[in-house]
Amino acid sequence: MAEIKVKLVRSRIGASPAQRKLLDSLGLKRREMVKTFKDTPAIRGIIAKVPHMVAVVE
C-alpha cells in the first residue's frame, strides 16, 4: 500500500473544534509538522475536511 506525507501548513489557532479534532486524529500538533500515513480512504477523507490547513507532500 502506498504512503502519503501530510504537512500542517496553517496554525490550529482559529480552527473550529471539529477541525482541531481532525488534526488531533492525524497527530498534527504544530505548524510545519509532517506525518506519514498509509494511503487509505479514511485518511483521504480527513484530509478532504481540512484542505486549507494541510498539504500532501510528495
From Swiss-Prot:
Gene name on record? rpmD
Alphabetically, the GO molecular function entries are: structural constituent of ribosome
Q: Name one Pfam family in it.
A: Ribosomal_L30
Q: Matching Gene3D superfamilies, A to Z? A: Ribosomal protein L30, ferredoxin-like fold domain
Q: Which family does it belong to?
A: Belongs to the universal ribosomal protein uL30 family.
One of the GO biological process terms: translation
One GO CC annotation: large ribosomal subunit
What is its quaternary makeup?
A: Part of the 50S ribosomal subunit.
Q: Which InterPro entries match?
A: Ribo_uL30_ferredoxin-like_sf (IPR036919), Ribosomal_uL30_bac-type (IPR005996), Ribosomal_uL30_ferredoxin-like (IPR016082)
Q: What is this protein called?
A: Large ribosomal subunit protein uL30
Top-level division of the source organism's lineage:
Bacteria
The entry's keywords: Ribonucleoprotein, Ribosomal protein
Instruction: Give the matching HAMAP family.
Output: Ribosomal_uL30_B (MF_01371_B)
